[in-house]
Amino acid sequence: MRHIKIIKSISLIILLFLITSCSNNSAMKPEDFKNKEPRLIIEEYLSGNVKAWGVLQNRSGKVTRQFSADLNGTWDGKQLILKEKFNWDDGEVQDREWTINKIDEHNYEGTAGDVVGKAKGFSYGPAFKFEYVLLV
């Protein structure tokens, strides 16, 4: 069981990289992974407790902050409620709660209190990209 949690944590690091570092100008697109395995089903993957680690980079790619995060997701068959608690290396603690709806096999929409409008999610194979504007 411990091995599954470690693998899940490592996989989440990769997932968060895709979520946070992919921009509209990125050459890498989720569709590029449509025939790859294993398939990432985000609502299953994020159900329950997940631990994550990551970095924040500025536009030039310099790491400006690091974080660890505790995530807890609940999937009801239509909607994923994802609670995130970020612990930043400078001592800041930040909470966010997402409501994520699955539109179809590949598309998701999400909202959170500090997100402008709706987030758009795209899932193909093992890749998931989440595009949104965050209020800072």
Locations of the language-model features?
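Hydrophobic helical h-region of N-terminal Sec-dependent signal peptides
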Residues: 12-16
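N-terminal helix-cap/turn-to-beta initiation motif at the start of protein domains
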Residues: 33-49
